[in-house]
């Protein structure tokens, strides 16, 4: 069997994001670094936590927001379920009367 025709079936190599894209400037981590620097210390892993303050992860989640997160889709599913139940019950009643 010939190999190397672009039809690999094994796991592909995962691409890791570039660590340089995460910056602590403008995040609460910057304050931590400044306080550590005042004591002559440095957090070499601070950049690893910067993703928490960027992009979609940066939004503050309120208690109400957490409770209502899936409400839209849940309510839509509820309406569909009630509609299906109503339809199936009406079909069952029609069969009993005939």
From Swiss-Prot:
Membrane-related topology note: Single-pass membrane protein
Modification sites for N6-succinyllysine: 23
InterPro entries: NDUFB3 (IPR012576)
UniProt-recorded name of the protein: NADH dehydrogenase [ubiquinone] 1 beta subcomplex subunit 3
GO biological process: electron transport chain; mitochondrial respiratory chain complex I assembly
Gene name tied to this protein: NDUFB3
Subcellular location per the Swiss-Prot or TrEMBL entry: Mitochondrion inner membrane
Record PTM: Methylation at His residues by METTL9 enhances complex I-mediated mitochondrial respiration.
Top-level taxon in the UniProt lineage: Eukaryota
Presence of the UniProt keyword Thylakoid in the record: no
Modified residues (N6-acetyllysine): 23
Keywords: Acetylation, Electron transport, Membrane, Methylation, Mitochondrion, Mitochondrion inner membrane, Respiratory chain, Transmembrane, Transmembrane helix, Transport
Pros-methylhistidine: residues carrying this PTM: 5, 7, 9
Family statement: Belongs to the complex I NDUFB3 subunit family.
Pfam families: NDUF_B12 (PF08122)
Signal peptide stretch: none
Subunit and partners: Complex I is composed of 45 different subunits.
Modified residues (N-acetylalanine): 2
Segments traversing the membrane: 61-83
Task performed by this protein: Accessory subunit of the mitochondrial membrane respiratory chain NADH dehydrogenase (Complex I), that is believed not to be involved in catalysis. Complex I functions in the transfer of electrons from NADH to the respiratory chain. The immediate electron acceptor for the enzyme is believed to be ubiquinone.
GO cellular component: mitochondrial inner membrane; mitochondrion; respiratory chain complex I
């Amino acid at each position: 069997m010939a190999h190397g025709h672009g039809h690999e079936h094994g796991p592909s190599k995962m691409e890791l994001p570039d660590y340089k894209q995460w910056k602590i400037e403008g995040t609460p981590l910057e304050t931590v670094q400044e306080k550590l620097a005042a004591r002559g210390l440095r957090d070499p892993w601070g950049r690893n936590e910067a993703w928490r303050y960027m992009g979609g992860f940066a939004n503050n989640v309120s208690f109400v927001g957490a409770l209502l997160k899936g409400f839209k889709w849940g309510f839509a599913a509820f309406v569909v379920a009630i509609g299906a139940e109503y339809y199936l019950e009406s079909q069952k009643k029609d069969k009993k009367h005939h």
